[in-house]
């Protein structure tokens, strides 16, 4: 038989249970693997190789049927060698000296190639690792996965309508599950938090004077039972987004005016991004703790939004969920979303772009270094596409929010912070 390129012959991994201790078929010692076509220990492996290379001829001093054990295996070489052959060890599997040398050279070459690949593989710089650590800390400080604060909002009222009822397209009901509204008391309660920005910080910007140019749009106020609760939820979420943004490396280097523009224009997008953490594809809902805070599509409709927003929102949530982002990728995407130089009204797009480029480069390097295939395939491009999807959602949200806020009965339920952020969007 032709000599093989390896000193061992490995059977199919399924041929033995890895959890069962391996025993040498020759002496009963602990086996280290399949050697020369049989399961043996290192000692019997070496004995068989030496015996075959020397073409040794052994004679048993007894009756030729000695029992070989770990303790007496050196006493009778003849019976030990016979036992090796009996369990299937084959001399054809032994490498020649030349083959051994070639194998060593191949192993060395492979190690050198791996070392070269490793040296060329992108690595996160210390600065990039610092950025990721800061963003993770910022996210953990501004996102409570227990949703303990939800009990402080005005209670959810779902009415008599069945939970599965969906709004129609261009329905008069538009729902701010992500639109933004909260009672003044709720807003005041959270503005004292150190990781939030007071609504007054937006007050120097002029309020929009736009009027609804669609007289056919009316709101059935009786169908907006979830508006107060979801209003408080969004107002709370806006403040948490502000807290997160203030910790983005470089964000505080921007002028106060640019910080405000970026926050106002990205707030709803980041809320949608963050809500993916509680979104479940099993029933297309957002689960935030107890059953009272499990939000269905119908709840979004009962706060004022139509399918023109709800359908693409659900599609966005499902698509984002399927990307299986690491938490590091998620926080970087949120930061990139906030620090966007193409937002209307920014004064220093060059500085904003420099900050965003640093975040984008960190994200791309992280994906190459830490996100294994196949999930990493085109992942960065898919994430950037999600930002484009958010822009479309933001635009539709703005349209529906304006229709909602023009109704005095509805605007009374909105907090000052929500009115400032969503009522004065830069178009």
From Swiss-Prot:
Belongs to the nuclear hormone receptor family. NR1 subfamily. Residues 21-96 bind DNA. Residues 246-264 are annotated as: Interaction with coactivator LXXLL motif. Composed of three domains: a modulating N-terminal domain, a DNA-binding domain and a C-terminal ligand-binding domain. The 9aaTAD motif is a transactivation domain present in a large number of yeast and animal transcription factors. This is Vitamin D3 receptor. The gene is VDR. GO terms for cellular component: chromatin; cytosol; nucleoplasm; nucleus; receptor complex; RNA polymerase II transcription regulator complex. It comes from Sus scrofa. GO terms for biological process: apoptotic process involved in mammary gland involution; calcium ion transport; cell differentiation; cell morphogenesis; decidualization; intestinal absorption; intracellular calcium ion homeostasis; intracellular receptor signaling pathway. Residues 168-193 have a biased composition (Low complexity). Zn(2+) 1 binds at residues 24, 27, 41, 44. Nuclear receptor for calcitriol, the active form of vitamin D3 which mediates the action of this vitamin on cells. Enters the nucleus upon vitamin D3 binding where it forms heterodimers with the retinoid X receptor/RXR. The VDR-RXR heterodimers bind to specific response elements on DNA and activate the transcription of vitamin D3-responsive target genes. Plays a central role in calcium homeostasis. Also functions as a receptor for the secondary bile acid lithocholic acid (LCA) and its metabolites. Transmembrane segments: none annotated. Calcitriol binds at residues 143, 237, 274, 278, 305, 397. Residues 127-423 form the NR LBD domain. Residues 149-201 are annotated as: Disordered. Gene3D superfamilies: Erythroid Transcription Factor GATA-1, subunit A (3.30.50.10), Retinoid X Receptor (1.10.565.10). It comes from the Eukaryota. Keywords: Cytoplasm, DNA-binding, Metal-binding, Nucleus, Receptor, Transcription, Transcription regulation, Ubl conjugation, Zinc, Zinc-finger. It is found in: Nucleus; Cytoplasm.
């Amino acid at each position: 038989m032709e000599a093989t390129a390896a000193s061992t012959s490995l059977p199919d991994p399924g041929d033995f249970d890895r959890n069962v201790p391996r025993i040498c078929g020759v002496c009963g010692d602990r086996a280290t693997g399949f050697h020369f076509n049989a399961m043996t220990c290192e000692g019997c492996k070496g004995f068989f190789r030496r015996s075959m290379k020397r073409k040794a001829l052994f004679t048993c001093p007894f009756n030729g049927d000695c029992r070989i054990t770990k303790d007496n295996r050196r006493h009778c070489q003849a019976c030990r060698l016979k036992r090796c052959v009996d369990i299937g060890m084959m001399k054809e599997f032994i490498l020649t000296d030349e083959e051994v040398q070639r194998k060593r050279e191949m192993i060395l070459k492979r190690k050198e190639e791996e070392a070269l690949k490793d040296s060329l593989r992108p690595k996160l710089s210390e600065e990039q690792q610092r950025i990721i650590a800061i963003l993770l800390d910022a996210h953990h400080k501004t996102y409570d996965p227990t949703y303990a604060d939800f009990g402080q909002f005005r209670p959810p009222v779902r009415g008599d309508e069945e939970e599965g009822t969906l709004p129609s397209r261009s329905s008069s009901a538009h729902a701010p599950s992500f639109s933004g509204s909260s009672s003044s008391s709720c807003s005041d309660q959270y503005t004292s938090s150190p990781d939030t920005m007071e609504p007054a910080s937006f007050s120097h910007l002029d309020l929009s004077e736009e009027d609804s140019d669609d007289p056919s749009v009316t709101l059935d106020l009786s169908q907006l039972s979830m508006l107060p609760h979801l209003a408080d939820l969004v107002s709370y979420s806006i403040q948490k987004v502000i807290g997160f943004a203030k910790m983005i490396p470089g964000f505080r280097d921007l002028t106060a005016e640019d910080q405000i523009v970026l926050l106002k224009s990205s707030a709803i997008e980041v809320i949608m991004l963050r809500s993916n953490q509680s979104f479940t594809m099993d029933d297309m809902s957002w689960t935030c703790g107890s059953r009272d805070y499990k939000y269905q599509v119908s709840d979004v409709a009962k706060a004022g939004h139509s399918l023109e927003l709800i359908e693409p929102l659900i599609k966005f949530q499902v698509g984002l969920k399927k990307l299986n982002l690491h938490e590091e990728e998620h926080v970087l995407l949120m930061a990139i979303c906030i620090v966007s130089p193409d937002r209307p009204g920014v004064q220093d797009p060059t500085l904003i772009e420099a900050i965003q480029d640093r975040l984008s480069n960190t994200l791309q390097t992280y994906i190459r270094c830490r996100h294994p295939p196949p999930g990493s395939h085109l992942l960065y491009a898919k994430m950037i596409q999600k930002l484009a999807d958010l822009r479309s959602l933001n635009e539709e949200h703005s349209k529906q929010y304006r229709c909602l806020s023009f109704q005095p009965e509805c605007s009374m339920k909105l907090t000052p912070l929500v009115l400032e952020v969503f009522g004065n969007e830069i178009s």
